[in-house]
């Protein structure tokens, strides 16, 4: 049997073949979301019978690559060694330990994701009344210019995010002080990007704002919200836990520069 030594782009109409390879786990949500949405950036060894997959997504710092498959496939080592420019790498357990071998120049950090436990999902999360919260429309894009661009990184612009995605805002005294949007989605999870302005955080309202926004998204969607942060971001971790997102998932991330 011929084994390809390279990874090639695959047409979206063949993406269903990839579903068994890309698990619906918290760390892999951005990758599975690409496949479910039929977006470009997917490479495989064999379009007819894929066994390894690389999914490339744009991020503000460069690109993020998610890898799935077996470590002994020759195409993976060649693909990873050929990567250039700022890149973050994440991989399934069978591959992750091989990345430092293939790319000894990679730096290592830890990422952590939080969601509801699979049992008793709503037991500790009481949805607050939606006071001061509303779903944003495409015409609201002009109000987001002061917010960080990573909120809509997966869409390219705030206008695109509001046209194609879901975002809610929290208002205090008619001022937009917090936003939460769905960065990517799978059958089970909604990965949430959320931000509260500095003054509102200093005044102690970050928890209340994020709680109301998560409640609005969950009421509409019914999926498991997923918050991801650096493992060193103690404030984000404390916020996630205070919101009853107590199921923790750790993932090693490799950075190439």
Put a short name on every predicted segment.
Residues 156-198:
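A conserved beta-strand-loop-helix scaffold within acyl/acetyltransferase catalytic domains
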Residues 73-79, 196, 202-219, 237-242:
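Conserved acetyl-CoA-binding loop-helix of GNAT-fold acetyltransferases
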Residues 95-107, 207, 231-249:
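Conserved active-site alpha-helix within GNAT-family acetyltransferase domains
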Residues 1-28, 119-155:
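Short amphipathic alpha-helix that is part of the acyltransferase structural core
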Residues 34-50, 159-169, 190:
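A short helix-loop-beta-strand connector motif used in the catalytic cores of GNAT acetyltransferases and
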Residues 192-194, 225-229:
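Conserved hydrophobic beta-strand within the GNAT/NAT acetyltransferase core sheet
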Residues 29, 38-42, 46-138, 254-255:
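Acyl-donor-binding surface of acyltransferase catalytic domains
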């Amino acid at each position: 049997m011929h084994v390809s030594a390279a990874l090639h782009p695959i047409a979206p109409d063949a993406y269903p073949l990839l579903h068994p390879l890309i698990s619906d786990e918290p760390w892999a949500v951005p990758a599975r979301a690409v496949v479910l949405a039929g977006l470009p950036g997917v490479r495989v060894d064999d379009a007819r019978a894929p066994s390894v997959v690389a999914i490339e997504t744009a991020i503000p710092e460069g690109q993020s690559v998610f890898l799935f498959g077996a470590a002994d496939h020759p195409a993976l080592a060649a693909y990873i060694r050929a990567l250039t420019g700022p890149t973050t790498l994440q991989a399934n357990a069978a591959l992750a330990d091989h990345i430092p071998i293939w790319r000894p120049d990679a730096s290592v950090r830890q990422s952590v994701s939080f969601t509801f436990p699979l049992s008793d999902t709503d037991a500790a999360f009481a949805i607050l009344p939606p006071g001061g919260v509303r779903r944003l429309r495409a015409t609201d894009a002009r109000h987001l210019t002061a917010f960080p661009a990573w909120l809509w990184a997966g869409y390219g612009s705030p206008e695109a995010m509001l046209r194609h995605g879901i975002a809610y805002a929290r208002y205090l005294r008619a001022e937009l002080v917090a936003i939460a949007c769905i960065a990517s989605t799978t059958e089970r999870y909604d990965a949430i990007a959320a931000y509260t302005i500095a003054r509102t955080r200093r005044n102690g309202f970050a928890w209340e704002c994020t709680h109301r926004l998560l409640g609005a998204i969950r009421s509409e969607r019914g999926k498991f919200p997923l918050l991801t942060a650096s493992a060193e971001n103690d404030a984000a971790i404390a916020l996630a836990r205070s919101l009853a997102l107590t199921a923790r998932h750790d993932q090693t991330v490799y950075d190439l520069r």
